[in-house]
Design a protein with these regions (language model features):
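Structural motif
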Residues: 37-48
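Proline/glycine-rich low-complexity loops and linkers
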Residues: 46-48, 52-59, 63-136
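Glycine-rich phosphate/diphosphate-binding loop of Rossmann-like nucleotide-binding domains
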Residues: 1-39
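Flexible, glycine/charged-enriched surface loops at secondary-structure junctions
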Residues: 32-34, 134-137
């Protein structure tokens, strides 16, 4: 199953992309493309494009901001009028928590901008959910 990655104000893109591709291949996911956004508007545009042909999109970065640029703030504003089936925190003992949102058959996974942390999340609390989704598709 194909998926896409959107890096949002991420600093460790090449390291994260390599770790993410490796983790996702183990879950039966193939990264179709990777895109980049530096602000909330660009993130929105990239997500619309990504969801136009993939049902699973991963965003990396933006979790460490404490202002309106925070991906948590941007996504809260974006989905406030959308009914989500699942909105779950992906606990990460090694740093920033990730998040998973599902609306219908589309899934957005928000991950920290750190290869070790995203690897821990994808091999930990997100693994069973994503594996089950891929198998059911």
């Amino acid at each position: 199953m194909n998926c896409r990655i959107v890096f949002y104000s991420a600093k460790k893109t090449s390291y994260c992309e390599k770790a993410l591709r490796k983790s996702l291949s183990g879950l039966g996911l193939n990264v179709k493309t990777a895109a980049y956004a530096v602000n909330g508007e660009g993130l929105g545009e990239q997500l619309v494009e990504a969801f136009s042909d993939c049902d699973i999109v991963f965003t990396v970065g933006g979790l460490s901001f404490d202002d309106r640029r925070s991906i948590k703030t941007v996504m809260s504003n974006a989905v406030r009028d959308i009914e989500t089936d699942i909105c779950r925190k992906l606990k990460n003992n090694g740093g920033e928590d990730g998040y998973i949102l599902r609306a219908g058959n589309q899934i957005l996974v928000i991950l920290p901008d750190d290869p070790e942390q995203l690897d821990e999340i994808l091999h930990g609390c997100a693994a069973d959910y994503l594996s089950a989704y891929v198998k059911s598709a």
